[in-house]
Regions:
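Short clusters of hydrophobic/aromatic residues that line enzyme substrate/ligand-binding pockets
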Residues: 257
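A short acidic, helix-capping loop that chelates divalent metal ions and anchors anionic groups
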Residues: 88, 253-254
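Extended substrate/RNA-proximal surfaces in nucleic-acid metabolism proteins
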Residues: 54-206, 261, 265-269, 274
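An N-terminally biased module of ancient metal coordination in phosphate/nucleic-acid-related enzymes
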Residues: 1-73, 156-158, 171-253, 262, ...
Length: 275
């Protein structure tokens, strides 16, 4: 039987809406055999997810999505199959947590000035872990300032808007070195979602490969066939393994755990590096 993989999804440990237990249950309902919980800059949900995965016969891979800075842009690096208790890993995640908290507080202050009372407290009440922009968006919907999350980003939280705070994250080489020290593999998350031209995507991949990166996401739930083939060609051209993941955050019509996730035959699957 061919295994069904989803190596990128989120829970309430970061900005997802399902608990780790609920997420694993939904993955099981969707026929997923191998799952990686990749919350933003935290591994706090993995132990809970693993308990449910063991009950349901799902193989759970340790994962985390690390926020990094590259050429003035925010780039996400997915870490897979690592020792989450490794000292270098725990130190980096502690640093990221501090940076994320600092940013969250600054966003709260800006929202207060923009006429949103108790913004930080309201967002924190919706968060199970670190406060993210997604939690602020949900709070803005809750109090009636906007009608949906997208409007919250367009009006307040998106890049260049009045309450946007630029993040200060680690650089990519530091992220990769920490991943390797903990025995894992480093993967560029969703390369097509950074609003970059093909030239800039190649520059990112070249730097990532030069710094020791292992793979890139080639398949996700919402892409076109042409996008998948394009990313597969880049993975082969730069000798990177190919990963796949829905980047599931909440139930919706267009993104689902395990949905439309398969790799073109010509690529090297990332799980071949797990042994």
């Amino acid at each position: 039987m061919t295994k069904k993989y989803d190596l990128h999804c989120h829970s309430t440990a970061s900005d997802g809406v399902l608990t780790p237990t609920e997420l694993v249950q939904r993955a099981h309902e969707q026929g997923v055999n191998v799952l990686a919980l990749c919350d933003h800059d935290t591994v706090m949900g993995i132990d809970e997810a693993k308990i449910e995965a063991n009950k349901l016969g799902i193989e759970l891979i340790n994962g985390v999505e690390i926020s990094t800075n590259w050429e003035g842009r925010g780039i996400h690096i997915v870490r897979l199959n690592f020792d989450k208790t490794h000292p270098k890993m725990t130190a980096l995640l502690a640093e990221q947590k501090s940076l994320r908290e600092k940013r969250a507080v600054e966003i709260g202050h800006k929202l207060e000035k923009a006429g949103v009372p108790n913004a930080y407290e309201g967002a924190k009440a919706l968060a199970n872990g670190e406060v993210t922009r997604a939690h602020y968006a949900r709070y803005l919907v809750q109090i009636g300032k906007v009608s949906n999350d997208g409007q919250a980003f367009k009006r307040y939280l998106g890049g260049g808007k009045s309450c946007f705070v630029k993040a200060e994250w680690v650089d990519i080489p530091t992220a990769i070195d920490t991943i390797h020290a903990a025995g894992g593999v480093a993967v560029i998350a969703h390369p097509m979602r950074y609003n970059m031209t093909g030239k800039w995507i190649r520059r990112l991949i070249v730097d990532f490969k030069q710094w020791g990166g292992d793979g890139m996401e080639v398949a996700d739930s919402g892409q076109t066939k042409d996008q998948r083939q394009y990313l597969a060609r880049l993975a082969n051209e730069y000798d990177l393994a190919a990963s796949l993941g829905s980047d599931f955050h909440f139930p919706c019509g267009w993104i689902e755990l395990g949905k439309n996730l398969f790799l073109p035959e010509e690529v090297k699957p990332i799980w071949t590096l797990f042994e």
